[in-house]
């Protein structure tokens, strides 16, 4: 193909640029360099745009997964909540909201199985793991009460599997996280009493009923310690105190009557 004699094509930066023989070589160099830079920045700019679009797509996908996880959690679809929060964490392991949602979903599943009296050890272990990771991300007090309760449930599940399981460390950590978690105090006192540390158990039960006068189990368990030691008067004192604080509690009502009947029998027999 013939080209005009005063107009040829020069290949620069993979683009065909026109040259003009009557222009000096210096001017031509400047022109071609400038045009090359324009082409370079156009290509580079397109790469930046593509990268930005990719980041936006990933961010949008994460947001969608997060939204779906929140919605699933709200309606009680915990398996789907776990799946969506896990997708977010695959791309962003330190995402606080996704980690919190995942921990809550595992907690809810484990709690549901507790009500059905099913084995929950593996679920509480996983829940505790998620809360532990969460505390490394979020140092606020928002997560500590649930983490504390999780450790209580984990200790109880371990004891259900093996009555000799070492759970004191878990209970102490639970109490440290939430000093108002009287369930952990109560379980710790039960273990101490079973190990023969009756005085230690009594102190914990007394602490519980002083701080939380409507904690029925502490009254029942403290009364049992006195009853087993044949101190029926003290047992009646504790149970009746609990019955007064919680008149609708059937267990306290029952043992208060039992203690009263025993004391009356002892009076009639001259043993008291």
Give the role of each language-model region:
Residues 64-91, 108-117, 156-157:
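Alpha-helical segment of the N-proximal tetratricopeptide repeat
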Residues 65, 96-97, 141-143, 148, ...:
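Helix-start (N-cap) detector for alpha-helical repeat units in TPR-like alpha-solenoids
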Residues 77-83, 111-132, 160-173, 194-207, ...:
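Structural signature of tandem alpha-helical TPR/SEL1-like repeats
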Residues 91, 137, 141-143, 177, ...:
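Structural marker of alpha-solenoid helical repeat scaffolds
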Residues 101, 146-147, 153, 187, ...:
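Canonical tetratricopeptide repeat
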Residues 228-272:
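Terminal, low-structured helical/coil segments at or just beyond the last alpha-helical repeat
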């Amino acid at each position: 193909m013939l080209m005009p004699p005063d107009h040829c094509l020069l290949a620069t930066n993979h683009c065909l640029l026109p040259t003009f023989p009557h222009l000096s070589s210096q001017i031509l160099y400047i022109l071609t360099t400038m045009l090359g830079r324009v082409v370079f920045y156009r290509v580079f700019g397109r790469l930046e745009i593509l990268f930005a679009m990719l980041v936006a797509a990933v961010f949008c996908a994460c947001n969608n997964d997060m939204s779906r996880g929140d919605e699933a959690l709200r309606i009680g679809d915990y398996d789907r909540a776990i799946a969506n929060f896990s997708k977010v964490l695959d791309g962003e392991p330190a995402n606080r909201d996704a980690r919190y949602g995942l921990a809550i979903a595992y907690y809810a599943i484990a709690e549901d199985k507790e009500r059905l009296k099913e084995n929950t050890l593996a679920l509480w272990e996983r829940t505790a793991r998620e809360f532990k990771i969460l505390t490394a991300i979020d140092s606020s007090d928002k997560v500590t009460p649930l983490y504390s309760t999780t450790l209580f449930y984990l200790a109880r599940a371990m004891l259900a599997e093996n009555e000799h399981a070492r759970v004191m460390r878990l209970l102490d950590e639970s109490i440290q996280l939430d000093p108002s978690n009287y369930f952990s105090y109560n379980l710790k006192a039960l273990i101490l009493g079973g190990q023969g540390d009756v005085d230690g158990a009594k102190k914990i039960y007394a602490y519980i009923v002083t701080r939380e006068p409507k904690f029925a189990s502490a009254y029942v368990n403290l009364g049992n310690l006195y009853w087993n030691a044949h101190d029926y008067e003290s047992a009646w004192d504790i149970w009746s105190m609990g019955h007064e604080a919680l008149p609708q509690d059937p267990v306290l009502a029952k043992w208060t009557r039992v203690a009263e009947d025993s004391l009356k029998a002892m009076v009639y027999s001259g043993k008291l």
